[in-house]
Each structure stands twice: as structure tokens, then as C-alpha cells.
Amino acid sequence: MVFSVSIFASLAPYLVSALLLFFLIEQLSYLVKKRNLPGPLFVPPIIGNAISLVRDPTSFWFKQSDTAGTSPGLAANYLIGKFIIYIRDTELSHQIFSNVRLEAFHPLGHPFGKQLFGDHSLIYLFGEDHKTVRRHLAPNFTPKALSTYSDLQQIVMLRHLRQWEESFSGGTKPVSMRDLVRELNLETSQTVFVGPYLDKEARNTFCTDYNLFNLGSMALPINLPGFAFNKARRAVMNLEKTLSVCAGKSKKRMATGEEPTCLIDFWMHAFVTEIESGNPPPLHSEDEAIGGLLFDFLFAAQDASTSSLLWAVTFLESHPKVLSKVREEVAKIWSPQSGHLITADQLAEMKYTRAVAREVVRYRPPATMVPHIATNDFPLTESYTIPKGTIVFPSVFDASFQGFTEPNRFDPDRFSETRQEDQVFKRNYLAFGWGAHQCVGQRYALNHLVLFIAMFSSLFDFKRLQSDGCDDIIYCPTISPKDGCTVFLSKRIVTYPNL
């Protein structure tokens, strides 16, 4: 024992020297990559500023944006061994989105996405492989498919709205909407994506696993047993396995000639039709691969929709004239007492309500950044080249407040047929991405938001519980109001729709 201590004591100076040398090299590497970009001159060894990010992501990212505002739209930092660049300028962000290819930039979906999602995710496909998969996804979002989903969305929404009315209506007790909306969206996603293929027990397990994934996506990326990140990775594996079983069941059902009733059915129906025509099975048509792609849909839809629905309630309450116009438009087209769901044609008529939905997404884009990794050195400007291995964060949020008329004002009329700012400032409307990896389900997502706005505003009166900073942004992992959108609810109608 004494011998071991003496050996350690003799080696200690060398170990300390080696550690200090490593820290010095790390700092010098950071400064060389940073060059003249604004950003911290010193970063904590190894972990960088990851603790600041995890402790208060809102403050961290706003600080990056402010720092980038002092330069041509760029700011540097360091996170767990990775040099990062925050991109505030819209045109510089377009250079990233327009150069998603093997030799330039790879999307990540999450700063440590490959560890979390695995390599098979749609996010990480490129070239012909990516084009082929997206082409086979097209049947999932035809007008017929979207109309089928619309009915399912409304049925789930009405069931949850009825529960809210029974539990919280009366206007005497405030309720935080975050968990209510999250549960609504999770059931909607399950029902629309895999419908009849999940029993009650599977749905409960599904919810538990998704919550573990959600928590882990916000944690430090420590992939060891007992840590939240590791639990999230295991939850993803469980979710993908569950979804792959659903894919197999759907394939068998579609092979019998039955009509599609959910997203996986439309997808598998197209696969079965192609194979019956004598073509080989499409790429990534194995049950396991489809399970992974279905999880991509779930990840893209779930938290983004939760964010948008919460902000919609927030802004409708704070803009009574907008709320009044929504109610007036919806009442002319659909009545809760009609005994019918909103049809596809009626949904298309709700032009102002759709403009409100688009403005909600512009004003508070759910995913504020879209991280990519540079696979090679990339000359971004005349004076700065992004080093290979850098994680870049093009800011969708900052782009939303550039170009548009009075961008800091919540103004749905900017999307009217008269002003058409969605076309005039199209390059600044990046909430659904840009280029080859643009969101394939954006029409579904907007329909979901429009349906919720129409139904919620028709069925409920609502008043926010005002508190200091209630509208401040927090990340969980998409952005939402700090107070969880806490409101007083009271019903507007005498009888609840019986649909």
C-alpha cells in the first residue's frame, strides 16, 4: 500500500503536467477555430459551457444570439469537446440548409443526435437514398390521407377537450395547459400514426418511454446506466421496437386489400402495391427500419405541436381582436352543435384561422435551431471558414424576426392574400426547414394547429393567470411559455358536441 502511494506520488507531477498540457491544447484549438468570431475567450475544460446550457437553455441561446448580433451574424462557443457556431443571419443559415450533403453538412436533429436516435434516422440519410425514402413517404400526405388524419385528430381533440371541460371548466381554478396539451398530442400522434395497432397497455408503455426520451434529450449526454441520457436512448429503442411491430401488423392488413385508416396504413399500402406490381421491396421497407422512421415522425410532431398549441392559446388570449375574428370565421363555417366533424373543404375555408396558425409558428417557431455538423472545412464568408467537425446552429427563431413587416408584432394579417408575406419573405420563414430536408409533414402540422384553434376557441372562454415572466420562453425541449400557459377555463356552449 505504501509502495503504491509512493509510486502515485512520484507520478503525480507528470500526470498533472499531462493534464495541464491537454487543457492548454484544448484552449488553443478552440481559439484557433474561433479566430475573430465573437465568443468567450476561455471555455471550461472538456465540458465547455454545457452546464450553462443545461441549467438555463433559454439564457444560453439568447446570449449566443446577442453575441452573434455584434458580428456579421455568427458566434462561437464550446460544448463537451465540440466547437460550435451559432448562426443568426438568415442568408448564412441558408448556406447551411442548401449544402446538406456528404461532403458539407449533416443534419443532427439534436446536438448529440446520433447517440440518441441511432444512424438509421431519416435525418441522417442523403442523396438518392434520402430522395427514395421521401418519395415513398408521399402517399402519407395526399389530400385523402390528410382528410383521414383530420377526422382522427378531431376525435382525439374533442375527447380531451371534453375531459378538460369536465375537470377544469368553471373559471374558478387555474390549470397549466402544458401537460394537458402534451397528453392530447401524444394520443393524437399514436392514433394518427399507428391507429388500431396499439392496445391500451402498449399506449401506456409508449407514453412512459416517450417521457423518458423527453427528459433525456435535455440532459447531459452521459451514456451510462442510471443517467437520463442513457434512459432516453433505451426508451428510443423500445419505442422503435413497438412501432416496428405496428408496421408488421399494418403490412399484413394492407396485403388483404383493406382500406388504410392511419398513416402507417397509407405507407404500407403503397409498399404492398409496389411489390404486387413486380417491383423489388423499396429501400428501408423492413419493419425495423420503418419503426425508426416512424419514431422520426413522432419526434418531429409531438413536441413541436405541443409548443405551437400552447403559444396559440397564449396569443389568442393576449390578442382579443384576433380571437374574435377567429371565432367569427369558424362560426360561419362550422358549429359544435352540427353533429359533424370539420370537413376538409371547411378546413380550407378557414383562411384567417390558418393565417393565425402560420403567425404562431413564425412568432414562436417550436424548434428554434436546426443543428448540423460540418464534415469538411466550409467557407461560409469571405473572412471565415467553418472548421471540419464544427456543430453549427442556424437559428430559425432569429430568421423569423428578419425581413417581415414589424416582425416583433403578432400580426396574422401578414399572411393574408393581400399582403402575402409568406411569399415576399419566404426565405425568412424557416420554421419547417428549407431544402432537401424540409419538414415532410408540414401540412399535417398546420392542419393540426388550425383544428385545435378552431375547436378550442369555439368551445372555451379562457383567461390567463398573469404572473411575472409568464410569457418568457423556456425549452422543454421545444419552446413554451414559462408558466406552462396557465389559464382559467369556462365553457362557451350549453351542450358539448356529441360526435
UniProtKB/Swiss-Prot annotation:
Its cofactor is heme. Disruption phenotype: No visible phenotype under normal growth conditions, but production of brassicasterol is abolished. It catalyses: 5-dehydroepisterol + NADPH + O2 + H(+) = ergosta-5,7,22,24(28)-tetraen-3beta-ol + NADP(+) + 2 H2O. Expressed in the vascular tissues of roots, shoots, stems and leaves. Expressed in root tips, carpes, siliques and seeds. Keywords: Heme, Iron, Lipid biosynthesis, Lipid metabolism, Membrane, Metal-binding, Monooxygenase, NADP, Oxidoreductase, Steroid biosynthesis, Steroid metabolism, Sterol biosynthesis, Sterol metabolism, Transmembrane, Transmembrane helix. InterPro entries: Cyt_P450, Cyt_P450_CS, Cyt_P450_E_grp-I, Cyt_P450_sf. It is found in: Membrane. Induction: Not induced by pathogen infection. Heme binds at C439. One of its GO terms (molecular function) is monooxygenase activity. The keyword Hydrolase does not apply. One of its GO terms (cellular component) is membrane. Its EC number is 1.14.19.41. The chain crosses the membrane at residues 5-25. Pfam families: p450. GO terms for biological process: sterol biosynthetic process. It is a single-pass membrane protein. Plants overexpressing CYP710A2 show higher levels of brassicasterol/crinosterol and stigmasterol, and lower levels of 24-epi-campesterol/campesterol and beta-sitosterol than the wild-type. No activity with campesterol. Belongs to the cytochrome P450 family. This is Cytochrome P450 710A2. It comes from Arabidopsis thaliana.
